[in-house]
């Protein structure tokens, strides 16, 4: 059987489970009203759209989405934008809130518990392979290639991994591997002595939060883990170390299945779990030749499509045209005679006359009043920025009125603006 046909048969035997219940506390006020996977990204998408689009483009069309923390925004997005799969062809996206399977007091206690609480649903669909995905990373990956790698290897678990500098290892689950890619050790966020990639001294393999299991093996692991009172019921801390100890874990480097892939192509994967990382990944898209190609017709990023008129850029009342460079603007935006550079504007943003906006991420339904100056600002949905406001130039004022990171990125929310107006 050739590789194409082999992959075709395999993805029919697989089901994906997207873990989308996390708060993402390091995003601070951006997740006050929504789960991290529901946070806006890239001018028109939500973060979860990337994992779901990877599933569809890879042929994986049996998908469960596990939700918990402040899930209304996420559920509404999935219902509006992801209801096009055809049930009569055994295609679906199941929305899976916490089942309180263990008892009536506990919601999901960890990533492994989130899967365990849906074990009956998984079994009812009868997949041979279960693909467990984090719903909060930005990347493009062909899961069918990883699935084929897993099936051909003979291992019972395969872990997706991305190459990082050793100096960044403290923030990730790091794996040691042998020359055949068998995982020999797995350490969650090591502070020192992180295992390096064979043949290097300064590069490590970090877990991407992507796992493929033989389904029966996964069920056995989860049922054993749930009875362990010492367990935190987490894949990275408990399940994967157990699999490694049983010599059943294979490492799958992201470079083997990233989209696009090939010589000289740097795989693009971003954990947007902090305000700085979120801001940087959004601004990546404003580059002349962005590393992440959202214009690829062969691997589209799907999302909910609100029916809106095109963005419009017009002179102000004095005839000043303004200048817009390296900026993405979604439908329904209107900009009057302002200067905007290297920024992203989500749908229905209004920028009034005389503004100067640089390196900003502006979420839907924001109004920026006349003569504002904004630099390195992330503005949450629905903010009404008063005329003449300056953000991003005075670190002391920014830290007093808003949330400012050590790198100088300022987060502005509707609540912050409302409180400022009351002073």
Curated annotation (Swiss-Prot):
Keywords: ATP-binding, Carbohydrate metabolism, Glycogen biosynthesis, Glycogen metabolism, Nucleotide-binding, Nucleotidyltransferase, Transferase. SUPFAM superfamilies: Nucleotide-diphospho-sugar transferases, Trimeric LpxA-like enzymes. It is an enzyme of class 2 (transferase). Signal peptide: none annotated. The keyword Transport does not apply. It catalyses: alpha-D-glucose 1-phosphate + ATP + H(+) = ADP-alpha-D-glucose + diphosphate. GO terms for molecular function: ATP binding; glucose-1-phosphate adenylyltransferase activity. Pathway: Glycan biosynthesis; glycogen biosynthesis. Its EC number is 2.7.7.27. One of its GO terms (biological process) is glycogen biosynthetic process. Alpha-D-glucose 1-phosphate binds at residues 108, 173, 188-189, 207. Involved in the biosynthesis of ADP-glucose, a building block required for the elongation reactions to produce glycogen. Catalyzes the reaction between ATP and alpha-D-glucose 1-phosphate (G1P) to produce pyrophosphate and ADP-Glc. Homotetramer. Belongs to the bacterial/plant glucose-1-phosphate adenylyltransferase family. PANTHER family: GLUCOSE-1-PHOSPHATE ADENYLYLTRANSFERASE, GLUCOSE-1-PHOSPHATE ADENYLYLTRANSFERASE-RELATED. This is Glucose-1-phosphate adenylyltransferase. It comes from Francisella tularensis subsp. mediasiatica (strain FSC147). The lineage of its organism: Bacteria, Pseudomonadati, Pseudomonadota, Gammaproteobacteria, Thiotrichales. The gene is glgC.
């Amino acid at each position: 059987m050739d590789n194409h046909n082999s992959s075709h048969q395999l993805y029919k035997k697989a089901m994906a489970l997207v873990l989308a219940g996390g708060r993402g506390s390091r995003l601070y006020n951006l997740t006050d009203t929504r789960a991290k996977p529901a946070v806006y990204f890239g001018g028109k998408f939500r973060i979860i759209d990337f994992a779901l689009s990877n599933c569809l483009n890879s042929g994986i069309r049996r998908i469960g989405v596990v939700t918990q923390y402040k899930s209304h925004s996420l559920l509404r997005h999935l219902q509006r934008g992801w209801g096009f799969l055809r049930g009569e062809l055994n295609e679906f996206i199941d929305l899976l809130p916490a089942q309180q399977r263990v008892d009536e007091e506990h919601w999901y206690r960890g990533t492994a518990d989130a899967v365990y609480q849906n074990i009956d649903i998984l079994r009812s669909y009868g997949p041979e392979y279960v693909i467990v995905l984090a719903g909060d990373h930005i990347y493009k990956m062909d899961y069918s290639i990883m699935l084929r790698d897993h099936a051909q290897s003979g291992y019972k678990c395969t872990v997706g991994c991305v190459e990082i500098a050793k100096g960044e290892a403290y923030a990730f689950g790091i794996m040691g591997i042998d020359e055949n890619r068998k995982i020999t050790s797995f350490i969650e966020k090591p502070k020192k002595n992180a295992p390096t990639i064979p043949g290097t001294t300064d590069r490590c393999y970090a877990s991407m939060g992507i796992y493929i299991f033989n389904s029966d093996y996964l069920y056995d692991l989860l049922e054993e883990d749930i009875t362990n009172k010492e367990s935190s019921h987490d894949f990275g801390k408990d399940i994967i170390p157990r699999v490694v100890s049983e010599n059943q874990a294979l490492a799958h480097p992201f470079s083997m299945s990233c989209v696009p892939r090939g010589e000289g192509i740097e795989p693009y994967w971003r954990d947007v779990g902090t305000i700085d990382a979120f801001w940087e990944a959004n601004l990546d898209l404003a580059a002349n030749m962005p590393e992440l190609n959202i214009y690829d017709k062969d691997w589209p990023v799907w999302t909910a499509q609100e029916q809106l008129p095109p963005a419009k850029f017009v002179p102000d009342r004095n005839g000043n045209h303004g200048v817009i460079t390296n900026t993405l603007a979604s439908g329904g935006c209107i900009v009057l005679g302002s200067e905007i550079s290297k920024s992203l504007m989500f749908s229905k943003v209004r920028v009034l006359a005389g503004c100067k906006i640089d390196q900003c991420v502006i979420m839907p339904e924001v109004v920026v009043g006349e003569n504002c100056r904004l630099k390195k600002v992330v503005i949450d949905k629905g903010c009404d920025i008063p005329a003449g406001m300056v953000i991003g130039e005075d670190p002391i004022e920014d830290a007093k009125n808003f949330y400012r990171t050590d790198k100088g990125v300022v987060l502005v929310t509707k609540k912050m603006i409302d409180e400022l107006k009351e002073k």
